[in-house]
Amino acid sequence: MTDFRTLDDAGPLQGKRVLLRVDLNVPMEGGRVTDATRIERVVPTIREIADAGGRVILLAHFGRPKGKPDPKDSLKPILSTLSEKLGRPVAFGEDCVGEAAASAVAALKDGDVILLENTRYHAGEEKNDPDFAKALAANGDIYVNEAFSAAHRAHASTEALARLLPAYAGRLMQAELDALTKGLEAPARPVIAIVGGAKVSTKIDLLENLVAKVDMLVIGGGMANTFLHAQGKDVGKSLCEKDLAETAKRILAAAKEKNCTIILPVDALVAREFRANAENETVPVDAVPSDAMILDVGASSIATIDGAIEEARTLVWNGPLGAFELTPFDTGTVAVAQHAARRTKAGQLVSVAGGGDTVAALNHAGVGEDFSYVSTAGGAFLEWLEGKELPGVEALRAQG
């Protein structure tokens, strides 16, 4: 983390107006928050700044209101949950810039917290407009970015604003950057990556970057079928992007050149129906019945993956190994996740995981708390794994 300034570098916060960019893009139903994870994760930083006498001004986006106010994308319904989790009142500003924001911020006392309305109510936000960023900056003395999940987008509140005020990484951002550095940039070796999920097409850049950086790469989920097909195996009615066979071959060749061991399933749990508890059998991957589909890795594959994890000192995981939302096709994902969690708890493995399905799969396996770090930042986590620069992170680095 030496490249980034954190709250430790910000000096006394007493009386300072702190523009804190957070991710409050939480799922809502009927005007109520259904999963408060993202709110809970930013509470410690809000509390730390407020307890130090800072005036906390929360900036966030919600939904996709297309650059103009839309009541369904208002942040106001989040206020009660935010206040409850924080254990103190939170004021609300009807706009994030202009007179409404200025007067609301002017009324703050040391230690107060205010949430300003959706930054995406203004077209300048997604355009990274310098004038809009200046209007945001007018209400703050320093800027703290706590929204790693939005760091892959060069928006006014994540990028341009960070260049107008003294800028720092919040505690959550700091933890995320620390974890990712340990996972890929300066890892303890050997490093194993597990990449699953349905499609190769969405993860080509990711796979190409990983084969150059990791020692072992496990390919699972629906995307493994494309690789098996590329090797000339019949995958029956399984999900398979046959038009990407050449891409799969290219990735396999690149892995060989970089001395990255590719681990593909050797056996599979197959069924004729895509539903929970469908009649199933375990078969070798070169004997998949033509009317069946692969829905999980088999016992021999699990043993191979577990053995590889035994050798590794670092694990990076993105995507499930099978259709984990349907029993018993969650067996592979659950078994491997629990094995990785045991190694992590024993201090033998640094485990970093991220991506929506991955977080859900680890929670389903009951090990969401046992990995070294689980990132809630879907797109930003993927782009980091792809080796891309993240504008919101680079803006913090530039001042470091």
UniProtKB/Swiss-Prot annotation:
Q: What family classification does the UniProt entry report for this protein?
A: Belongs to the phosphoglycerate kinase family.
Q: Which residues form a coiled coil?
A: none
Give the protein name, as stated in the record. Phosphoglycerate kinase
List the Gene Ontology MF annotations in alphabetical order: ADP binding; ATP binding; phosphoglycerate kinase activity
User: Where does the record place it?
Assistant: Cytoplasm
> Per UniProt, where does ATP bind?
K203, E325, G355, G356, D357, T358
Q: Does the keyword Protein biosynthesis apply?
A: no
Q: Name one GO biological process term.
A: gluconeogenesis
PANTHER family, alphabetically?
PHOSPHOGLYCERATE KINASE, PHOSPHOGLYCERATE KINASE 1, CHLOROPLASTIC-RELATED
